Design a protein with these regions (language model features):
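Sec-dependent N-terminal signal peptides
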Residues: 4-13
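Sec/Tat signal peptide C-region and signal peptidase I cleavage site
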Residues: 15-19
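Sequence-level preference for short, compositionally simple segments enriched
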Residues: 20-354
Length: 354
């Protein structure tokens, strides 16, 4: 009966003249949430499906040990009531830790949009040392947008798991310890907050933010006007995973610049030493430019082989290429985000009671 009422709710929201197709999740009901994902996958199976909105009220949606919950449809907008109040959480057993096994959500669709929610992976990271890979969003999709999405975990928090992917983040927050923004494709992070956590239970060890493995795209990870919050240990911007990793930090605000290690990027690569690692216009909390004039690093593999020497400070000429229209030549995520945010705001006002 509950399933029948759930489906009837979808039809009523469509029939009563709303411009958008909407599924409204029952407040705090994780079964209703899972039903919504399944129904959205059925309704929006076609890659050109009309936009479908899933509205999730503030609440704690506990998946328990369930992992890899799929968002398999296309052109789905998953809209919470607020970033801090709408929390989707899982807690995998530490025995299954792994980058492809633990995700809270696994996005598999094209054109999906996430807004105003938190994904939390509660795997017992410190009990899993030296490993503890616990993903919040494993994104195997294409052209995903995350707007005001918070991800709480430690290692491998966000995983762009599609070699040709294009994704866009804005005003989001990602927490972690090591390689906690990792994977392939071209991903633009606009005005996001990057927060490091303790690397180990006793606080020892350095943090590493990004681990790109750029292979079939050109640009890799672009962090633009982001803020790094680090109150715990020293850290690097990132390190090489494999193939031709690319990562740039543009106009970054460092709240604790003294904790950024001198090389700025980890000189030890995992499977490759070559890379395109750059920064430009780095600032302290008062907005003062603290970018070194030069920073030449000798990158090697972990065994000190295959040295690759590179300057990591970007020139103005290089900077001029970093525009969203150059990265995403046939997609305008900025325009799409504005449109979806406006539509979502109207739906939130209509369906969420303050």
């Amino acid at each position: 009966m509950k399933r029948l009422l759930f489906l009837l709710g979808i039809l009523l929201l469509t029939i009563e003249g709303f411009a958008q197709r909407v599924i409204l999740v029952e407040k705090g009901d994780v079964v209703s949430l899972l039903d919504a994902f399944r129904e959205a996958a059925r309704l929006n199976n076609d890659r050109d499906s009309e936009r479908l909105f899933i509205l999730i009220p503030n609440g704690y949606y506990d998946l328990g040990e369930l992992t890899l919950t799929r968002v398999a449809g296309n052109n789905i907008a998953i809209i919470g009531e607020s970033m801090e109040g709408t929390i989707i959480r899982n807690a995998p057993d530490k025995s299954i830790e792994g980058i492809s096994r633990t995700a809270v959500l696994q996005n598999r669709g094209k054109g999906n949009y996430y807004q105003d929610l938190t994904l939390k992976n509660d795997l017992d990271y410190y009990a899993s040392e030296p490993d503890g890979r616990a993903v919040c969003l494993q994104d195997k999709g294409f052209r995903t947008i995350c707007n005001r999405v918070r991800m709480l975990s430690y290692q491998d928090t966000y995983y762009s798991d599609n070699e040709k992917c294009q994704h866009y983040f804005k005003d989001s927050e990602i927490h972690g310890t090591i390689d906690f923004i990792c994977g392939a494709g071209d991903v633009w992070f606009e005005r996001c907050k990057i927060v490091t956590e303790k690397r180990s239970r006793d606080g020892s060890g350095n943090n590493i933010i990004a681990a790109p493995r750029t292979s079939k795209t050109k640009w890799g990870y672009i962090f633009n006007r982001c803020t790094i919050v680090n109150d715990v240990s020293d850290y690097y911007y990132g390190r090489s995973w494999h193939t031709n990793p690319a990562c740039v930090w543009l106009y970054t605000t460092l709240l604790t610049p003294e904790k950024l290690l001198p090389a700025r990027y980890d000189p030890k690569g995992m499977k490759t030493s070559s890379n395109y690692f750059k920064e430009y216009g780095t600032m302290d909390a008062k907005g003062r430019n603290i970018t070194p004039k030069t920073n030449v690093v000798t990158f090697t593999l972990r065994d000190d082989t295959k040295p690759f020497v590179a300057e990591t400070i970007m020139t103005r000429e290089e900077l001029s290429k970093y525009k969203t229209k150059n990265i995403f030549t046939s997609w305008n995520p900025v325009k799409q985000l504005k449109k979806l945010e406006k539509q979502s705001r109207k739906l939130q006002k209509k369906h969420f009671k303050n």
